[in-house]
Amino acid sequence: VLAYNKDKQLTNANSVTKENLRNYLSMFRMLTDAVNIKNGFIVNLGVDFSIIPLPGYQGKAVLLKCIARLKQIFKIDQWQMNEPIILGNIATELDEIEGVQTVVELSVHCKHDKASGYSGNYYDIQSATKNKIIYPSQDPCIFEIKYPQSDIRGKVVTF
């Protein structure tokens, strides 16, 4: 189980919340069942991408639209525990933005520096990626972009 802080960022649920949940669930359990409530792991991410804008479009304006769309895609309300990240779907979402000719690069990396406010949970994104799908760990975890203003970085490429 996880909770939100005042900025709608994920955090571990406090013991009172877990105890209340345990009491509520105990009304529905069988006599031999046990209720074990654990915190999920928060894996903080950063996203880097590059786009080529269509001729006649302002690169910076198109880039800002792409960043806004990524913020929307990674809004924490849209995600569930143990949901994989399908990079192809994200690239398609960016490709569909008006003014984007193509997405040149799209990469996701782990942000785990506790001193910078991240969860401290390191996750090897490269090893967990197969066929452009980032799979979560077997332990309950959720992917989060904690600071969208700085964790989503894009650039315009021209040839």
Predicted segments with their positions:
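Acidic, low-complexity glycine/serine/threonine-rich segments
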Residues: 1-159
